[in-house]
Amino acid sequence: MITGTIARISGPVITARNMTGSRMYDVVWVGRAALPGEIIRLEGDEAVIQVYEDTTGLMIHEPVENTGVPLSVELGPGLLASIYDGVQRPLPALYAKSGNYISRGIMVPGLDREKRWAFNPVKKAGEMVQTGDVLGTVQEFHLVHSIMVPPGVSGEIKTIASGEFTVTDVVCTLADGTEITMLQRWPVRKGRPFVKRLDPEVPLLTGQRVFDTMFPLVKGGTAMIPGGFGTGKTVSEQTLAKWADTQVVVYIGCGERGNEMTDVLTEFPELTDPRTGYPLIERTIMIANTSNMPVAAREASIYTGITIAEYYRDMGMDVALLADSTSRWGEALREVSGRLEEMPGEEGYPAYLATRLAAFYERAGRVICAGSEEKTGSVTIIGAVSPPGGDFSEPITQNTLRIAGTFWALDANLAYRRHYPSVNWIRSYSLYLEDVEDWFSEKVARDWYQFRGRAMYILQKEVELQEIVQLVGPDALPDKEKVVLEIAKIIREDFLQQSAYSDDDSFCPLEKQYWMLKIIIWYYDAIRAAMRRNVPLRQLLSIPARSEIARMKEQRDLDRLKRLSDIVWEQTENLEVQTCSTAA
């Protein structure tokens, strides 16, 4: 083991001498307190190390020990429903050791070494296996956890066990003597191997109308949620974590307030997944690196989360990774870069900011997993961005924009008007619309894309008309343009607006979304058809069905909702008859 000494201390960055033979990203123990750190630069016999603990009290000439291995995470049964810090130390175990505040230098393994798991083998002695093949399964809550052959390992099975084991017990031995346990270790900065990347063509359904219908995201895609203070980034991320159509959710609190992680911990055990009926906490893995924790560990928390997500992807599962927020990671990069005395880029961020962001987001994807059996899994990354003052021209927002396929722009003005989710429908976009068009046409309705396009046209037309209204008032507009304003208002208030705290409206099934939008567009068509027959606009906007349209989001009976479209046409037709008979 290489042992050096501390030569310089600058906040979370220290320089150690006599480190010849060390490699980049090796984990080291710093000082007599054995603080964990990672080598981020090598210069001659000196190593520059970022420390994942508070460096207060460290002194020059204290020892630095190189472990010789990169920063890695432990992968295996026991990850689900766990909460870790940025370097995969389980917070409940840290609390048991040190109380409310984490003491420095405490290292606890990521997976429980005492708990026993029932291992059911699916392979037999004499069979050939390769990287990614499933050796057996373990029941982890309601999910079947596959125990796979680790990357880089293959051969003939010599023995395979059955029964209850801890994660460190050997469950399989290969003919060449390789022993396989239920525990794998994998370096966080290196993506796990797969066979082939697939086209993103299956939408990630979230139960949120503005996301699913207007700006869809795909499984294996990337999305960003930028917004200023109070625009609803965290509530949006938590809503996606609750209702996303995935088997596993990895929620990373990167530099955010501790109360937000507390919300997740208190709410998720009480909420049930609408698709499985099981508590949401049983499919969630939380990584809490709150704002008062060391800044260097923010980068580690991001990489820890994506590595865990890739592990479940390799089992053939769909995984959603939610990072809240990547801006705090960027700020940590800026602080460490300043300590390293590197040449600053735009707004003080390091020149390699775009490279780091791209390397993270590119680990998303829908892939054919490694192994002889064909499995398809996906990792979808949704990153919140917190631009100072809501300024979308700042570097992190701009660099993420180049990478992300879906852009959900949160608007402070909408948030102040209590319109949630406060997604600005003019500034937001999705690059996946054409990819999911066939899926929606086959699974939902052939005219889904048409209705969505017409709704977007009405909303864009409203923005143009609002400029005229501000100058001359709404009464100066002709009736055909007043209709556009009224229907746009219905789309905004009765379709796009959705309460995260309503039992009836927090999750909206896709078929219900389609029928809600269809009824609104049909109402628009019915009004225009009746106006051509000289029916007064005032009467058309006050038909009894108008109040039913406003209450669609609370309507649980889909058949009753479908009948509403016929009621709309009947009531507008009856108005025409009444108008004609009155004129006669």
Swiss-Prot record:
**InterPro entries per the UniProt record, alphabetical:** ATP-synt_VA_C (IPR055190), ATP-synth_a_Xtn (IPR031686), ATP_synth_asu-like_sf (IPR023366), ATPase_a/bsu_AS (IPR020003), ATPase_F1/V1/A1_a/bsu_N (IPR004100), ATPase_F1/V1/A1_a/bsu_N_sf (IPR036121), ATPase_F1/V1/A1_a/bsu_nucl-bd (IPR000194), ATPase_F1/V1_b/a_C (IPR024034)
The residues that the entry says bind ATP are 227-234
Q: What class of enzyme is it?
A: translocase
GO biological process: one example:
proton motive force-driven plasma membrane ATP synthesis
* Keywords in alphabetical order: ATP synthesis, ATP-binding, Cell membrane, Hydrogen ion transport, Ion transport, Membrane, Nucleotide-binding, Translocase, Transport
- Return the EC number: 7.1.2.2
Q: What does the record give as the function of this protein?
A: Component of the A-type ATP synthase that produces ATP from ADP in the presence of a proton gradient across the membrane. The A chain is the catalytic subunit.
Tell me yes or no: is Membrane among this UniProt entry's keywords: yes
* Family per similarity comment: Belongs to the ATPase alpha/beta chains family.
User: What is the recorded membrane topology of this protein?
Assistant: Peripheral membrane protein
The catalytic activity, as recorded, is: ATP + H2O + 4 H(+)(in) = ADP + phosphate + 5 H(+)(out)
Top-level taxon in the UniProt lineage: Archaea
Give the NCBIfam families listed for this entry.
PRK04192.1
Instruction: Tell me the protein's name.
Output: A-type ATP synthase subunit A 2
Against Pfam families, the record matches this protein to: ATP-synt_ab, ATP-synt_ab_N, ATP-synt_ab_Xtn, ATP-synt_VA_C
Q: What SUPFAM superfamilies does the annotation carry?
A: C-terminal domain of alpha and beta subunits of F1 ATP synthase, N-terminal domain of alpha and beta subunits of F1 ATP synthase, P-loop containing nucleoside triphosphate hydrolases
Q: Name one GO molecular function term.
A: proton-transporting ATPase activity, rotational mechanism
